């Protein structure tokens, strides 16, 4: 029987085999492809260039804003500043209007102006076989060579912090794409609040990263996206070769987000989670970093600790220590599959 892959990220085991064969022979490539590595890094002389490419596939609303912020988040995890964007727009045949194209591009331009990013190129076309727009961004950032942070930097004893909570992005997408299914459980004001998770608490983590890095010794950062926090923890563990021990009860899940997930029967820890930033911080600096974020009105929780390898993620509670399951796909994909 043919093995058909589910919607979502390519399984880590397959991806790992594929990436192991990638030709990366240029000595200027300091960080190439790998599980849990948000960006590539290239030595450009005085500074390092950081590269990221990411699509928007689930959402159909505010696509341009999503695109810029999702790519900027990954650049932020390296301590770099996002600088230059290229975007590709694949638009559905028979549905695309000039107003649609202008709307998406206007959103991209507005988000780039807000983050001081220059749009330097890209591609757009009307494409056969699509039922909705698919857009892809490639973002380049810049960081001084002595300030680079990668997921490989997590060390035993570091504290594991999470900003804002989860799943911010899933909450916004579900409220925007399936309002009729939520209207039976949420009053109009709550539904509007869930829709506005796109901007409050927001999908961007560039500010979170800047504050954290300025406040203490951040050793690694990772951006939870598809597969949610659970997948992000596993990716960070694999990238660093460390074991992560968390208390699942410490994970901040906003009440409204939990209710939205409950309507669809989703695990909040396994749903797309842009807007949160996962950090490992030197133990002696963890309180200082957390307080700096909280003073900036950014929720920050201490989830647990980094331990020696081998790579793994463990839930530690009063009942004992169990391995945290790694999701096979993103919870939100099930909802789109039902629609």
PLM region spans:
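A short beta-alpha structural unit
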Residues: 274-280
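Solvent-exposed alpha-helices and their adjacent loops that cap or buttress functional pockets
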Residues: 32-34, 42-45, 78, 112, ...
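Phosphate/diphosphate-binding glycine-rich loops and adjacent basic-rich segments that engage nucleotide
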Residues: 145-200, 338
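Glycine-rich phosphate/pyrophosphate-binding loop regions near the starts of catalytic domains
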Residues: 8-163, 168
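Helix N-cap motif at beta-to-alpha junctions
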Residues: 281-287
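Beta-strand->loop->alpha-helix junctions that form or flank phosphate-binding loops
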Residues: 31-34, 224-225, 243-252, 270-272, ...
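Active-site-proximal betaalpha loop/short-helix elements
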Residues: 92-96, 196-273
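Acidic, Ser/Thr/Pro-rich beta/coil linker or hinge segments at domain junctions
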Residues: 3-6, 10-15, 296-339
């Amino acid at each position: 029987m043919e093995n058909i892959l589910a919607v979502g990220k390519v399984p880590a085991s397959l991806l790992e085999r594929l990436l192991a064969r990638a030709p990366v022979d240029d000595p200027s490539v300091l960080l190439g492809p790998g599980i849990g590595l948000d960006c590539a890094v290239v030595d450009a002389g005085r500074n390092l260039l950081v590269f990221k490419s990411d699509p928007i596939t689930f959402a159909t609303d505010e696509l341009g804003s999503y695109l810029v912020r999702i790519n900027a988040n990954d650049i932020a995890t390296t301590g770099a500043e996002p600088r230059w964007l290229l975007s590709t727009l694949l638009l559905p045949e028979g549905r695309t209007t000039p107003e649609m194209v202008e709307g998406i591009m206007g959103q991209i331009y507005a988000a780039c102006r807000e983050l001081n990013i220059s749009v330097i190129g890209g591609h757009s076309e009307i494409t056969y076989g699509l039922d909705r727009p698919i857009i892809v961004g490639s973002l380049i950032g810049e960081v001084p060579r002595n300030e680079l942070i990668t997921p490989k930097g997590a060390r035993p004893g570091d504290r594991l912090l999470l900003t804002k909570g989860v799943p911010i992005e899933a909450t916004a997408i579900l409220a925007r794409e399936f309002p009729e299914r939520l209207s039976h459980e949420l009053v109009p004001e709550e539904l509007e609040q869930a829709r506005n998770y796109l901007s409050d608490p927001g999908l961007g983590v560039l500010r979170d990263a800047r504050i954290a890095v300025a406040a203490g010794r951040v050793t690694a950062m990772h951006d939870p996206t598809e597969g949610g926090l659970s997948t992000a923890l596993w990716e960070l563990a694999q990238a660093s070769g460390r074991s992560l021990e968390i208390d699942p009860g410490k994970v901040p899940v906003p009440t409204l987000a939990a209710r939205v997930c409950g309507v669809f029967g989703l695990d909040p820890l396994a749903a797309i989670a842009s807007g949160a930033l996962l950090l490992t911080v030197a133990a002696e600096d963890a309180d200082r970093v957390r307080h700096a974020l909280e003073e900036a009105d950014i929720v920050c929780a201490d989830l647990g600790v980094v331990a020696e390898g081998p790579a793994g993620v463990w839930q530690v509670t009063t009942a004992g220590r169990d391995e945290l399951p790694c999701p096979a796909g993103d919870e939100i994909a099930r909802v789109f599959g039902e629609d």
